Amino acid sequence: MQYKISKTLAAAMLAVMVCGNAYAFEKPVLLEDQGSFFAGGTVVTAPGSFDYTNPLNPAGQTLHGDHAYVFYQKPVGAHKLPLVFLHGAGQSKKTWETTPDGRDGFQNIFLERGFATYLIDQPRRGDAGQSTVSGTINAVPSDQFWFTNFRAGNAPDFFDGVQFSRDPEALNQYYRQLTPDTAKYDAKVVADAVSAVMDKTSDAVLITHSQGGGTGWLAAIKNPHVKAVISFEPGSAFVFPKGEAPQPLKTSSPFGPLTADTVTVAEFDRLTKIPIVIYYGDNIAESYTDEWNKDSWRIRLDMAQKFAAAINARGGDCTVVHLPDIGVKGNTHFPFSDLNNKQIADLMAGWLHEKGLDK
């Protein structure tokens, strides 16, 4: 005897199973659809012909790589525009999932709020590790560098009042979240793949973090399906019209001066057609300091403000929010997974509503 399970019943069963997890949603989420796919990428073909008797010879064989991987979930009755999430350097889609201390991340929080979510692993990272160019992964101890650079504190000490759990297991999970590039990072390759994702999602809001900020601008320039950009602590690759880039910003950071990238005026003007908001956390210096992590993010915040000013001077809509300036204290480089991430989610949801993006 065969049994048929309706799509709604299957979704309800999935919701129950999801909610049985130790780190479950605060309330059940009924999913209409869930799945994954690859987007973009290229195919390399070796010269010659494939020889069945010598299959390890690459002649005539193909290599599919440099694509993005996407995991998505769509709740029943979802808002019109989905949210597409792009991680930063040394990270993967895990950035947006369960937080290091086991709470709901933005994936779950915004599913609960009725948004379809699409989580990207960019080319040459995470589940999109297949590259069309060779690369080397060097196993170099660097956890404490990232702890410090991401402004949880000055390793091994946490900053006073920082929004990060002091549970040792949370720090263990935080470090294990780091993941390498399988080959050289290429902003154009990433932007092309993100644009291909947008072709599949159609109109959506793009949410980026750190290194993902720069490729996010390029994807928004390239693809009109990007209807808004929300960027958390973009760290580099701010774009300006050719001839209008600011001078490099000096810092005590080991990364060295921060330079701006340039695009054509026509390309830059595409960024003036969509709303953009940029968020930065706490423990960022106000003036030059030898405390390099705070100084590194000082110049990045400064460049973001120059970027916003350039957009707004052309009639655009770009806002930079330094969270301490609005009374939100203690955030690290990861506001969306910090202890107060629901407060950050409220800010983001409020902005989406203000811009009419949550219909």
Question: What does each model-identified segment do?
Answer:
Residues 207-216:
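Gly/Ala-rich beta-loop-alpha elbow adjacent to hydrolase catalytic centers
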Residues 103-129:
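Conserved alpha/beta-hydrolase
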